UniProtKB/Swiss-Prot annotation:
It is a peripheral membrane protein. Zn(2+) binds at C820, C822, C831, C832. Coiled coil: none annotated. Gene3D superfamilies: Helical scaffold and wing domains of SecA, P-loop containing nucleotide triphosphate hydrolases, SecA, preprotein cross-linking domain. SUPFAM superfamilies: Helical scaffold and wing domains of SecA, P-loop containing nucleoside triphosphate hydrolases, Pre-protein crosslinking domain of SecA. Its EC number is 7.4.2.8. This is Protein translocase subunit SecA. GO terms for cellular component: cell envelope Sec protein transport complex; cytosol; plasma membrane. It is found in: Cell membrane; Cytoplasm. It comes from Clostridium novyi (strain NT).
Length: 834
């Protein structure tokens, strides 16, 4: 603690001092509200709504509203908010992050700001990490909200559009970050406004905010359709990768990448029968080889992914859960499928995408809760404008956190851990053991079996039994091995007689690269003032120590002449570990910041497209816009074709008319001879007059009302098609940006500049295609209004955790020979699919 903090207190304590008078005000209503009947208490909700309608603010009514929610909670749930929970609730209402330790009742805390903000009628979203927790919290807390006259909904994976709309229209809606994000994307792909499900994004409370806004920040949400690329080349590239020897490639563990050596490049040129592997023409080969190398030499089975039912499934590195339905992007998933010799799925095409960073920044007010946020305080402030307030615990923490024990080898470390578990088991003290991978869990499990220690294993392979196992983990004599405990969401309550033997003992088998994940594991013990104990066991062979800890530490151990059996506990070692973790956290922050800088370019473009889509959906007449598009397309065509040279005048006019005949102009309506005596401006006028006259005739033929609907459907269809292609193009542009840094060019600035040019090209393409389709479309008078309820496949789990790979949902693909959904009556391939 610095001198400033010693004198003035920490930032959190200074901020909490400002909140205490509001807490005292809330307390002052207690006796009065206890005397109210249930009906009188319930009527307070309507009174508050009236006060807001008459100009009062949420802050004006906060003390009284919190007091009402507190009294209602005591009556309905049998739980009365402590003063610390009131502080947490105020911090959330202020749009900040409440850091509250495990077992301090975060779910109950959220009811206070949720109730207050729901009174405005604009909706409150409570985000949890999985469907199970969303349903559990909604079921429990809807009793309280219902008592106070508010409605509660929950968004889970298998709801249809009608059920989703109903849930979003409730006063308070629970759900996962994935579901909310996907619904936002789908709402911006609909053709009719009635198909949208979300309201405007108002106030959001994110539970486990560090997991969602930090761990998953590198994870774009992607809605995808099937691409056209063949999968055969993945098998060829995999075969090549498997023929390589160790000196044909180098593995960079820090960046998790593999590159061919000179010798490897020679082998590639020979294998693929090419002269120069680095040639731009061979980018396709390079891409497949890079992914095959990564799949074979950095991606580990049962650590990064599992093969289950002949399918490759990603394992979440933060929670150890299986992430069914998610796929690695950029062909890596297909490369792993080739490596494991399972069916290779086709690459997909991105239809819509957004990062969590940009989704959550759209809320008018954002807040969050977690047990561990302080280590990432700078990132919360810089990226989201959120500050972290540490809320004091209701009872003092009685857990003992022992210093780390360091062994020379991993083998010696695990032997010591097993001995420690066996000793603890003898006195019937429950033990929770945290591991970093499924592989390590199973190794430890085998060692404990040989030692005769009964235990439970909790990891991705068995997560169906998860809640059941966790509910018993605090009972006498229980030994539970768990892959990373982040986001488990279930408290471990101590069984009878456990306090007497020292509470829950937590053993970490390795330091995670994030201090926060270590703190989460520690925090499982010692909840609500319970006794407890935690300790981490580390070896110099652990990934974190091997890759990031300094060589100096290795030197110290050598000098001490430690044998495999010896262990050291020292401040220097603990500092070295913490510095290694800070180094990794810094690297990860830089990566997330870089992702955001690139995504901000896409985000500005996305906002323009989605805003215009929204205006079209809201039924604003497009007639003037379409006429402006017609004028713009014709003017630009004339400017592009007319060189101003007399000797090429006739040729210029012939090319101009041929070009416009493709778009709208019937043959022989106007001739080169008629136009060659006119100025460019007069030519524009003649051609625009013809177009406007033709358009008026088409409108009369189908009725103005029907024409407005056709304009809307066609414009949306073309915008969507062009936007999807633009997303792909921007993705390719971004992949090429790494080379710009070598040319002394700022890659982000280059991406911004070129991306802006590509966006302008896309807008011009939208105008031209819209005009072209509107002139060419043949409309059947009685054609039924198009319904485009886009269905996504349901192969995605509730999406916990934070893989750094895109989360994808799949869209149904329109067949080339199906009728075009735009209502033209033509086959898709001859209409919008051209």
């Amino acid at each position: 603690m610095g001198l400033f903090e010693k004198i003035f207190g920490t930032y959190s304590s200074r901020e909490i001092k400002k909140i205490i008078p509001i807490i005292n005000k809330i307390d002052s209503y207690e006796e009065e509200f206890k005397k109210l009947t249930d009906e009188e208490l319930r009527n307070k909700t309507d009174e508050f709504k009236d006060m807001l309608a008459k100009g009062k603010t949420l802050d004006d009514i906060l003390p009284e509203a919190f007091a009402v929610a507190r009294e209602a909670s005591a009556r309905v749930l049998g739980m009365r908010h402590f003063r610390e929970q009131l502080i947490g609730g105020i911090v959330l209402h202020q749009g900040r992050i409440s850091e509250m330790k495990t077992g301090e009742g975060k779910t109950l805390v959220a009811t206070l700001p949720a109730y207050l903000n729901a009174l405005s009628g604009k909706g409150v979203h409570v985000i949890t990490v999985n469907d199970y927790l969303a349903k559990r919290d909604r079921d429990q807390m809807s009793q309280l909200y219902g008592f106070l006259g508010l409605t509660t909904g929950v968004i889970v994976h298998d709801l249809d559009n009608e059920q989703r709309r109903e849930a979003y229209n409730c006063d308070i809606t629970y759900g996962t970050n994935n579901e909310f994000g996907f619904d936002y994307l789908r709402d911006n792909m609909v053709i009719y406004k009635e198909e949208r499900v979300q309201r405007k994004l108002n106030f959001c409370i994110v539970d486990e905010v560090d997991s969602i806004l930090i761990d998953e920040a590198r994870t774009p949400l992607i809605i995808s359709g099937e691409g056209d690329n063949s999968t055969d080349f993945y098998k060829v590239a995999d075969f090549f990768a498997k023929t390589l020897k160790e000196d044909d490639y180098t593995v960079d563990e820090k960046t998790n990448s593999v590159i061919l050596t000179e010798q490897g490049i020679e082998k590639a040129e020979k294998f693929f029968h090419i002269d120069n592997y680095g040639d731009g023409d061979n980018m396709q080969i390079q891409h497949h080889v890079v992914q095959a190398l990564k799949a074979n030499y950095t991606m580990k089975r049962d650590k990064d992914y599992m093969v289950k039912d002949n399918e490759v499934i990603i394992v979440d590195e933060f929670t150890g859960r299986l992430m069914e339905g998610r796929r690695y992007s950029d062909g890596l998933h297909q490369a792993i499928e080739a490596k494991e010799n399972v069916k290779i799925q086709k690459e997909s095409k991105t239809l819509a995408t957004i990062t969590f960073q940009n989704y959550f920044r759209m809320y008018t007010k954002l807040s969050g809760m977690t047990g561990t946020a302080q280590t990432e305080e700078a990132e919360f402030r810089e990226i989201y404008g959120l500050d972290v307030i540490v809320i004091p615990t209701h009872r003092p923490i009685a857990r003992i956190d022992a210093p780390d024990v360091v062994y020379k080898s991993e083998k010696a470390k695990f032997k010591a851990i097993v001995n420690e578990i066996a000793e603890t088991y003898k006195k019937q003290q429950p033990v929770l053991v945290g591991t970093v991978s499924i592989e390590k869990s199973e190794l430890l499990s085998d060692m404990l079996k040989r030692k005769g220690v009964p235990h439970q294993v909790l990891n991705a392979k068995y997560h169906e039994k998860e809640a059941e196992i966790i509910s018993h983990a605090g009972e006498k004599g229980m030994v539970t091995i768990a892959t990373n405990m982040a986001g488990r969401g279930t408290d471990i309550k101590l069984g009878e007689g456990v306090e007497e033997v020292g509470g829950l003992k937590v053993i970490g088998t390795e330091r995670h690269e994030s201090r926060r994940i270590d703190n989460q594991l520690r925090g499982r013990s010692g909840r609500q003032g319970d006794p407890g104990y935690s300790r981490f066991y580390v070896s110099l062979e652990d990934d974190l120590m091997r890759i990031f800890a300094s060589d100096r530490l290795q030197g110290v151990v050598e000098k001490l002449g430690l044998t495999d059996e010896d262990a050291i506990e020292s401040r220097m070692v603990s500092n070295a570990i913490e510095n290694a973790q800070k180094k990794v956290e810094g690297n990860n922050f830089d990566v997330r910041k870089s992702v955001l800088q690139y995504d901000d370019v896409m985000n500005q473009q996305r906002e323009v497209i989605y805003k215009q889509r929204s205006q079209v959906l809201e039924g604003e007449s497009l007639k003037e816009d379409i006429q402006e598009m017609i004028r713009s397309v014709i003017s630009e065509a004339v400017d592009a074709h007319m060189s101003g040279l007399d000797e090429t005048l006739e040729e210029d006019l012939e090319k101009l008319l041929a070009y416009l005949q493709e778009i709208y102009l019937p043959k022989n309506v106007v001739t080169v001879d008629e136009l060659k005596i006119k100025s460019d401006d007069e030519i524009k006028e003649i051609l625009i007059d013809i177009a406007e006259k033709m358009y008026s005739e088409k409108e009369e033929e189908v009725t103005p009302e029907r024409m407005r609907e056709i304009e809307s459907v066609i414009l949306l269809r073309i915008v969507d098609t062009k936007w999807m292609d633009h997303i792909d193009n921007m993705d390719h542009l971004r992949q090429g940006m790494g080379l710009r840094a070598y040319r002394q060019q700022d890659p982000v600035q280059a991406y911004q500049f070129e991306g802006s040019e590509m966006f302008d090209e896309m807008i011009n393409g939208i105008k031209t295609d819209t005009v072209k389709y509107l002139f060419h479309i043949q409309v059947e008078k009685n054609i039924e209004r198009e319904r485009v309820a886009r269905e996504t496949s349901t192969n995605i789990n509730d999406g916990e955790g934070g893989s750094h790979e895109p989360i994808k949902r799949k869209e149904e693909k329109i067949g080339r020979n199906d009728l075009c959904p735009c209502g033209s009556g033509k086959k898709y391939k001859n209409c919008c699919g051209r």
